[in-house]
């Protein structure tokens, strides 16, 4: 048996080579199932394109057969799977097109589940609920009902774009000095847990927009958790990288190392207790978590290991629903989350800086990359003044970050032939260093749209899985600032982000819906902590300003900057499907000549992207207001090839 690796040579050339698979690797893979088994329509029945990865050194035998598709979701599992030596499949298109609806998630199974809900007549929000629940099962290192989420929803029924803040909150017993004796407990263990909000947020949005039964939306995720799902390469890598975390927690160990050995990509994983929890929430609604038996079990598990979560915390949790924050940038209108998200404001500031040059050419070429780096540094210096507006007055900073005048003032500080030490950018506070997350985009036939980012923060959250509920606990308290914390950048912590009971921590999550002339132009968002804002900004510029096709806009190599250390991080890595992504040598040389210090980065943010063509193939849809029509152009959905997700189309 042979397996394929990719041998890469500069600048961007990768050559596939074949190596024999060791006997022990082949034997350990026997009986594994095909990740693409849960297909949702007949046109995918003959999929057999296999692409190997440089990160996983095993793939298995034989082509799939005997898949049975039924409306009861049995297609989520391989029939008689133990009879076959099957393979983990990460191939398939990173981009799909449709006139009727699309879902772009970071897992192919979840994209297809979302599309199934659209085919059943569901609103984009129905698809979003089912997709989010699926992601929480199959990508549990990044997402789940033990965490929180931001959602931006555009619905024709209300002619509004609304923001749903289901971000975790600090427990009632939390205080700004609670970690002064052991700062590690801010990031790991039960004390790092915020009050989870995802289920409450999904239910609140579904109540407003959903068409399908609440229970129906849970069935695919329940099936996956109860009867098993295949571990994708990205999850397999995360399990391996966090072996100590997994093996030190009884709940995580039971799910991800059930026989004392870590599960790997291609293995089947079960979380039966989570399936039971999802069944209860499906039957009884979110009250069973926030004021019922599931909540009581979760509180008991968390407090037994030293946490401070109480039933009162769960009962007090409220989803914040507001009009989405709107900003007019570069001839488009973006709709996103208000604070405590810093994403909408951060992206708006950077784009307004480019707009102030007076020409789209300002973003072109290697000089455009230099200007982007400088704009990002100014943005990061400004954004740490933000916090939860229910607790701190951030009116001045919100106004500045949306101001065209303020952006022009910053643009005048950007010099085209030089960069500067970090103190030039007028920083004051230590940066938020959030992690993880998962993002997906949904657009339906009516052009209703959902942009949702969901998170448990660090990989596997707090490193605690509640044994009685199967819920992985978030570590969102790590996103607060603490008065006594000494950060890697040696700057003082941001007072606007200090802990208070019921407060939401600052976030980099950037779910956006983009319109032009009141018509849907795009849906975008990303995962990857503080890398999200730079990544989403670059994809926006690549497509809407520089004219790249949607897939190319997402695939294009990216740069990142954190202000301190004063380093430009550039992508140089071979991703899950074997493609090598690296910043062009020409760009690296140019940036070094300007004084930038560069460092290669084998990682970055993951961006999902949906675009509607407004320049061609447009049909007028139904009237939604006086002399107003919804246009139906071709939808293109892209799942970032940096992870193992694939989009799906109706």
Task: Please place each PLM-identified region on the residue numbering.
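Short, low-complexity, Lys/Arg-enriched N-terminal segments of secretory-pathway carbohydrate enzymes
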Residues: 1-49
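Noncatalytic scaffold domains of N-terminal-nucleophile
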Residues: 51, 63-116, 124-285, 289-291, ...
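Internal maturation/activation junctions in enzymes
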Residues: 80-82, 259-260, 356-456, 465, ...
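Alpha-helical support elements that line or immediately flank enzyme active sites
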Residues: 117-118, 200-208, 284-289, 296, ...
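Active-site rim segments in enzyme catalytic domains, especially the processed small/beta chain
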Residues: 137-154, 158-162, 309-310, 449-518, ...
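Short beta-strand scaffold segments in enzyme catalytic cores
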Residues: 143-155, 438-442, 511-513, 605-617
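Short, small/polar residue-rich loop motifs at catalytic or cofactor-binding pockets
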Residues: 321, 434-437, 459, 507-509
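Extended C-terminal subregions enriched in glycine
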Residues: 483, 500-504, 536, 545-604
């Amino acid at each position: 048996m042979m397996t394929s690796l990719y041998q890469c040579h500069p600048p961007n050339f990768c050559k596939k080579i074949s190596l024999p698979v060791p006997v022990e690797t082949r034997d350990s893979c026997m009986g594994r199932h095909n990740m693409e088994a849960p297909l949702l329509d007949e046109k995918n029945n003959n999929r057999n394109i296999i692409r190997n990865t440089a990160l996983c050194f095993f793939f298995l035998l034989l082509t799939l057969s005997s898949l049975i598709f039924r409306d009861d979701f049995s297609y989520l599992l391989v029939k008689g799977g133990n009879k076959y030596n099957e393979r983990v499949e990460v191939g398939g298109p990173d981009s799909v097109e449709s006139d009727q609806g699309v879902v772009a998630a970071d897992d192919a199974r979840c994209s297809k589940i979302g599309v199934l809900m659209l085919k059943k007549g569901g609103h984009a929000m129905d698809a979003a609920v089912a997709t989010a629940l699926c992601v929480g099962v199959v990508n549990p290192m990044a997402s789940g009902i033990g965490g929180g989420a931001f959602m931006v929803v555009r619905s024709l029924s209300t002619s509004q774009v609304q923001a749903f803040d289901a971000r975790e909150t600090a427990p009632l017993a939390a205080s700004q000095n609670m970690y002064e004796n052991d700062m590690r407990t801010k990031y790991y263990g039960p004390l790092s847990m915020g009050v989870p909000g995802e289920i409450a947020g999904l239910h609140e949005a579904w109540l407003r927009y959903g068409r399908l039964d609440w229970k129906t939306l849970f069935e695919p995720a329940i099936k996956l958790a109860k009867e098993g799902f295949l571990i994708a390469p990205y999850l397999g890598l995360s399990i391996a990288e966090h072996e100590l975390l997994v093996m030190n927690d009884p709940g995580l160990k039971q799910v991800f190392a059930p026989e004392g050995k870590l599960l790997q990509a291609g293995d089947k994983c079960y979380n039966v207790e989570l399936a039971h929890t999802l069944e209860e929430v499906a039957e009884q609604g979110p009250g069973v978590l926030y004021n019922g038996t599931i909540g009581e079990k979760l509180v008991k598990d968390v407090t037994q290991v030293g946490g401070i979560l109480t039933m009162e915390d769960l009962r007090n949790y409220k989803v914040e629903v507001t009009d989405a924050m709107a900003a007019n940038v570069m001839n488009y209108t973006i709709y996103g989350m208000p604070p405590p998200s810093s994403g909408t404001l951060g992206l708006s500031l950077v784009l307004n800086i480019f707009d102030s040059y007076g020409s789209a050419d300002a973003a072109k070429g290697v000089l455009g990359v230099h200007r982007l780096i400088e704009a990002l540094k100014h943005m990061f210096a400004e954004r740490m003044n933000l916090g939860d507006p229910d607790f701190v007055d951030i009116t001045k900073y919100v106004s500045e970050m949306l101001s065209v005048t303020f952006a022009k003032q910053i643009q005048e500080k950007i010099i085209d032939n030089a960069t500067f030490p970090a103190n030039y950018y007028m920083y004051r506070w230590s940066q938020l260093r959030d992690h993880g997350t998962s993002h997906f985009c949904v657009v339906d036939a009516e052009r209703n749209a959902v942009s949702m980012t969901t998170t448990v923060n660090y990989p596997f959250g707090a490193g605690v899985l509640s044994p009685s509920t199967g819920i992985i606990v978030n570590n969102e308290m790590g996103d607060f600032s603490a008065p006594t914390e000494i950060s890697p950048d040696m700057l003082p912590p941001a007072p606007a982000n200090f802990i208070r009971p019921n407060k939401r921590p600052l976030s980099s999550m950037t779910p956006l819906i983009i319109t032009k002339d009141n018509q849907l132009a795009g849906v975008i968002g990303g995962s990857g902590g503080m890398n999200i804002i730079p990544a989403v900004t670059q994809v926006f510029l690549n497509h809407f300003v520089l004219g790249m096709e949607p897939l190319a806009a997402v695939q294009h190599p990216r740069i990142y900057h954190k202000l301190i250390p004063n380093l430009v991080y550039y992508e140089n890595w071979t991703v899950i499907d074997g493609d090598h992504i690296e910043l062009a040598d020409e760009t690296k040389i140019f940036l070094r000549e300007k004084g930038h210090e560069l460092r290669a980065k084998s990682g970055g943010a993951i961006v999902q992207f949906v675009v509607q063509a407004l320049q061609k193939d447009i049909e007028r849809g139904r009237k939604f207001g006086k002399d107003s029509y919804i246009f139906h152009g071709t939808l293109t959905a892209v799942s970032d090839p940096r992870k193992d997700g694939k989009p799906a189309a109706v």
